[in-house]
């Protein structure tokens, strides 16, 4: 330290005095994956992870999704929350499956990729489930299938509609056939709901692929998709390499699927709550829904 620096007040810097680095809290700013805009984290969260600049629907966590659906300040009950995955096959690729489970649980704060809850939507009972893509890409293993089936059973017991928000890369390869059998298990659970005359609404979000798209995600009485969501069994690059042809622009996006009759409608995330409330009330032959706090 020079003699001049010793005489200078602490708040004044000379040209050669290094500036102190200011620490920015992690997650305070996020970058839109579509337009590249820098977005203030708390405001983005309040906007349901939709970019205010370009309206791009970014990934949203499962609990945030469900909290935005159910009536505020009302009790919700989580279904099969105690279930956690096990490495029954002692599977190992670059890492052991058990290590991947622990890492995903630590990173996401969840035991597995599907959260299911029972609550009310504008005063009417509802069971809903949502995928958390932050847990191993929302892959479907035994716990996901069991939670989905139990959620359908709760809807059957209560006599209410069931809604599922899908965001998944498909079946979890580390569980082998245990994962693939969940396709049949979840489809059978929906069959029991159908026999009881209870509606099931499937909401397909980005991305919905693999075994999830080939089972319960496309079995809704009404299939709704968020804008520009990737929906399909195999990805477009895999299909192009297989058929050796260039795919049409927008292939497998929700708008393409709507134009070709594969889904029923596209709904902005901000309007999903009202849309689901209207549809479930109509299908259950209930009065037009009103907000719980306005009733």
UniProtKB/Swiss-Prot annotation:
Binding residue positions for Zn(2+): 32, 35, 51, 54
Pfam family, one: Carboxyl_trans
Keywords: ATP-binding, Cytoplasm, Fatty acid biosynthesis, Fatty acid metabolism, Lipid biosynthesis, Lipid metabolism, Metal-binding, Nucleotide-binding, Transferase, Zinc, Zinc-finger
Region Disordered, residue ranges: 1-20
UniProt key word Metal-binding: yes
InterPro entries, per the entry: AcCoA_carboxyl_beta, Acetyl_CoA_COase_Trfase_b_su, ClpP/crotonase-like_dom_sf, COA_CT_N, Znf-ACC
Zinc fingers typed C4-type, residue spans: 32-54
Entry EC no(s): 2.1.3.15
Localization: Cytoplasm
GO MF term list: acetyl-CoA carboxylase activity; ATP binding; carboxyl- or carbamoyltransferase activity; zinc ion binding
Associated pathway: Lipid metabolism; malonyl-CoA biosynthesis; malonyl-CoA from acetyl-CoA: step 1/1
SUPFAM superfamilies noted in UniProt: ClpP/crotonase
Similarity comment text for this entry: Belongs to the AccD/PCCB family.
Role, per record: Component of the acetyl coenzyme A carboxylase (ACC) complex. Biotin carboxylase (BC) catalyzes the carboxylation of biotin on its carrier protein (BCCP) and then the CO(2) group is transferred by the transcarboxylase to acetyl-CoA to form malonyl-CoA.
Complexes and interactors: Acetyl-CoA carboxylase is a heterohexamer composed of biotin carboxyl carrier protein (AccB), biotin carboxylase (AccC) and two subunits each of ACCase subunit alpha (AccA) and ACCase subunit beta (AccD).
Name this polypeptide is given: Acetyl-coenzyme A carboxylase carboxyl transferase subunit beta
Organism for this UniProt entry: Xanthomonas euvesicatoria pv. vesicatoria (strain 85-10) (Xanthomonas campestris pv. vesicatoria)
Gene transcribed to yield this protein: accD
């Amino acid at each position: 330290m020079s003699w001049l620096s010793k005489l200078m007040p602490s708040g004044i810097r000379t040209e050669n005095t290094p500036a102190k680095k200011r620490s920015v809290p992690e997650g305070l700013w996020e970058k839109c994956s579509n337009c590249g805009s820098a977005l203030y984290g708390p405001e983005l969260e309040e906007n349901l992870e939709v970019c205010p600049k370009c309206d791009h629907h970014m990934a949203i966590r499962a609990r945030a999704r469900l909290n935005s659906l159910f009536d505020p300040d009302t009790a919700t009950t989580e279904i099969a929350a105690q279930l956690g995955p096990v490495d029954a096959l002692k599977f190992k690729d670059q890492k052991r499956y058990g290590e991947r489970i622990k890492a995903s649980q630590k990173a996401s704060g969840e035991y597995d990729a599907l959260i299911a809850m029972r609550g009310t939507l504008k005063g009417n009972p509802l069971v809903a489930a949502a995928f958390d893509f932050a847990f191993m890409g929302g892959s479907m293993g035994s716990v996901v299938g069991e939670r989905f089936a139990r959620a359908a059973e709760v809807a059957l017991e209560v006599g209410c509609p069931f809604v599922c928000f899908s965001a998944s890369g498909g079946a979890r390869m580390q569980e082998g056939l245990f994962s693939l059998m969940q396709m049949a298990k979840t489809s059978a659970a929906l069959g029991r709901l159908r026999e009881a005359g209870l509606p099931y609404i499937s909401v397909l979000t980005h991305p919905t692929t693999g075994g999830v798209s080939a089972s319960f995600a496309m079995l809704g009485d009404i299939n709704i998709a968020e804008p520009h969501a990737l929906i399909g069994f195999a990805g477009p690059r895999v299909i192009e390499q297989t058929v050796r042809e260039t795919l049409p622009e927008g292939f497998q996006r929700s708008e393409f699927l709507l134009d070709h009759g594969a889904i029923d409608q596209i709904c902005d995330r901000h309007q999903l709550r009202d849309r689901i409330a209207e549809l479930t009330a109509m299908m259950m032959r209930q009065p037009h829904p009103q907000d719980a706090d306005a009733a």
